[in-house]
Amino acid sequence: MQLVLAAKYIGAAIATIGLLGAGIGIAIVFAALINGTSRNPSLRNTLFPFAILGFALSEATGLFCLMISFLLLYGV
């Protein structure tokens, strides 16, 4: 029984590593937005929706990793 519990904890810890990638992805998206806006301020209204889309996709992958981690911990 202890081995199964330890495997659950290790699996959940490994699944949360994906949150690191989501955080880095969000930082890259907004760094590119700031860089693009500083180079050409008139494109701000064009670039912002693409940045929000990139943010949403990056955050979704992080939430999927978190969901898998919770399923490993509290699932059957």
Curated annotation (Swiss-Prot):
Main localisation: mitochondrion
Molecular function GO labels: lipid binding; proton transmembrane transporter activity
Highest taxon in the source lineage: Eukaryota
GO-annotated cellular components: mitochondrial membrane; proton-transporting ATP synthase complex; proton-transporting two-sector ATPase complex, proton-transporting domain
Spans through the membrane: 14-34, 52-72
Classification via PROSITE patterns: ATPASE_C
Site (Reversibly protonated during proton transport): 59
Cysteine-cysteine disulfides: none
Key words of the record: CF(0), Hydrogen ion transport, Ion transport, Lipid-binding, Membrane, Mitochondrion, Transmembrane, Transmembrane helix, Transport
Pfam families from the UniProt entry: ATP-synt_C
Gene3D superfamilies attached to this UniProt entry: F1F0 ATP synthase subunit C
Location of the protein in the cell: Mitochondrion membrane
Annotated InterPro entries: ATP_synth_F0_csu, ATP_synth_F0_csu_DDCD_BS, ATP_synth_F0_csu_sf, ATPase_proteolipid_c-like_dom, F/V-ATP_Csub_sf
Stated family: Belongs to the ATPase C chain family.
Job of this protein: Mitochondrial membrane ATP synthase (F(1)F(0) ATP synthase or Complex V) produces ATP from ADP in the presence of a proton gradient across the membrane which is generated by electron transport complexes of the respiratory chain. F-type ATPases consist of two structural domains, F(1) - containing the extramembraneous catalytic core and F(0) - containing the membrane proton channel, linked together by a central stalk and a peripheral stalk. During catalysis, ATP synthesis in the catalytic domain of F(1) is coupled via a rotary mechanism of the central stalk subunits to proton translocation.
Name of the protein this chain belongs to: ATP synthase subunit 9, mitochondrial
Protein species of origin: Wickerhamomyces canadensis
